[in-house]
């Protein structure tokens, strides 16, 4: 099965576009993803990106809840209110919009981070710091990385 793995940092061009790494584009092609669902991550200052199946997975979780429950309402607020659909251009570039910049702090470079079934857009230094923190916490807990 194709997965989004590894990370890569690319520069944003003068028109505000960034090239999605070829390995990530290959996964999108293998999965026949035409439209990207992007949402503001719940934990990290990152934008999570996947196909419509990613949105559908969250909507199934919401549908399993009482529609008037606080959990269902919070999840909908995050998934629907904090999400947008986007498309890559013909050259495999993504427009780095205010939606992305405002939430992540991205300015001139984007770090693409594989998360198995989706990928994330990070401000490069924030990714390095979060990864170091995660390693440190696992080390303190005596867990193998």
Swiss-Prot record:
It is found in: Cytoplasm, Nucleoid. This is Transcriptional regulator MraZ. PANTHER family: TRANSCRIPTIONAL REGULATOR MRAZ (PTHR34701:SF1). NCBIfam families: PRK00326.2-4. One of its GO terms (cellular component) is nucleoid. GO terms for biological process: negative regulation of DNA-templated transcription initiation. It comes from the Bacteria. The keyword Transcription regulation applies. InterPro entries: MraZ, MraZ_C, MraZ_dom, MraZ_N, MraZ_sf, SpoVT-AbrB_dom, SpoVT-AbrB_sf. SUPFAM superfamilies: AbrB/MazE/MraZ-like. PROSITE patterns: SPOVT_ABRB. Transmembrane segments: none annotated. Forms oligomers. Its main location: cytoplasm. Residues 7-54, 83-126 form the SpoVT-AbrB domain. Keywords: Cytoplasm, DNA-binding, Repeat, Transcription, Transcription regulation. One of its GO terms (molecular function) is DNA-binding transcription factor activity. Belongs to the MraZ family.
